[in-house]
């Protein structure tokens, strides 16, 4: 999916407003995903999935860091996310549908924290961005 110049601007502006809350929002999105889509818990059998657990917060920070890296490399998402793609495809073997579920949960989380900035255009741009990230992360499944 091609991101337009307007999309890139919207993504960078929105992620800039996330700022120092990225790890918290990542953890919140994971918690939201686990509650809304309980089957996603199967990939984390060794985690304490209770609200506010250190493991969920830690993984939320990893998700946020990966997305921050992706925002910084919008013109080369495959290069920026290559190692993460290998990890999820070959070692973790995460079902690709789960990336869509996490993307949805992240959009809801961002909308709840940035209501004045989450315009339809920003929503569409972030959705395209997360779909592009998901496509990259599942590209090595073949």
UniProtKB/Swiss-Prot annotation:
Tissue expression, as annotated, is:
Red blood cells.
An example of a GO molecular function for this protein is: organic acid binding
Q: Which InterPro entries match?
A: Globin (IPR000971), Globin-like_sf (IPR009050), Globin/Proto (IPR012292), Hemoglobin_a-typ (IPR002338), Hemoglobin_oxygen_transport (IPR050056), Hemoglobin_pi (IPR002339)
What processes does the entry annotate via GO biological process terms?
hydrogen peroxide catabolic process
Tell me the residue numbers annotated for binding O2: 59
> What family does the database annotate?
Belongs to the globin family.
- What is the documented function of this protein? Involved in oxygen transport from the lung to the various peripheral tissues.
State the PANTHER family in the record: HEMOGLOBIN FAMILY MEMBER (PTHR11442), HEMOGLOBIN SUBUNIT ALPHA (PTHR11442:SF48)
Protein name according to UniProt? Hemoglobin subunit alpha-2
């Amino acid at each position: 999916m091609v991101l337009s110049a307007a999309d890139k601007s919207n993504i960078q502006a929105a992620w800039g407003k996330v700022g120092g809350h990225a790890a918290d929002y990542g953890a919140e999105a994971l918690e939201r995903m686990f509650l809304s889509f309980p089957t996603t818990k199967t990939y984390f059998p060794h985690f304490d999935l209770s609200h506010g657990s250190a493991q969920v917060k830690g993984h939320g920070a990893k998700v946020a860091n990966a997305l921050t890296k992706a925002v910084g490399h919008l013109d080369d998402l495959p290069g920026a996310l290559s190692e993460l793609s290998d990890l999820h495809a070959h070692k973790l073997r995460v079902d690709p549908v789960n990336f869509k579920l996490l993307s949805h949960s992240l959009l809801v989380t961002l909308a709840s924290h940035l209501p004045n900035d989450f315009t339809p255009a920003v929503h569409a741009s972030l959705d395209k961005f997360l779909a592009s990230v998901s496509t990259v992360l599942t590209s090595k499944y073949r």
